[in-house]
């Protein structure tokens, strides 16, 4: 059994969709998994575009030399904590991974899959779980009400109950 949360789910999807791997995967549990591209509103797309333009402008050496504290403060508030703490190379990897859509791989997964999701997840919304459930051939979805992206931490007893029932 392979179990993956968030980005770990993305890794498992890519692995399980391969034609052959050097070991057997009997079943998979994906928890609030990444892998489906987010649907962005026009306002969100515009915000991203403005961010990219501003970032290029603020990266100019002359501009930075004039306002280093302001620019450093602005940069310190951009992205997730993981992104802010990553090296520049790792940031590039994170951006590439987040923008990679794995939905075309989902029908290729041959193993039995259980999805466990928090209905209040904003990082990987419940909409993503429904897409995965629809596209993965042998798949079921368990939703933990009132939880977000870390459903297993927010309601551990309910999460454990789902896992125990599935793994019996």
Question: What would you call each of these model-derived segments?
Answer:
Residues 2-4, 31:
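Short beta-strand immediately N-terminal to the catalytic nucleophile in serine-hydrolase-like folds
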Residues 4-9, 118:
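Conserved alpha/beta-hydrolase "nucleophile elbow" surrounding the catalytic nucleophile
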Residues 10-18, 23-59:
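Flexible "cap/lid" loop of the alpha/beta hydrolase fold
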Residues 30, 38-42, 56-111:
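Conserved alpha/beta-hydrolase catalytic His-Asp/Glu region
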Residues 108-109, 115-117, 121:
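Short beta-strand/loop motif that positions the catalytic acidic residue
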Residues 122-128:
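Conserved alpha/beta-hydrolase "acid-adjacent" motif
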Residues 133-150:
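Catalytic histidine neighborhood in serine/cysteine hydrolases
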Residues 147-160:
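Catalytic histidine-centered segment of alpha/beta-hydrolase-like enzymes
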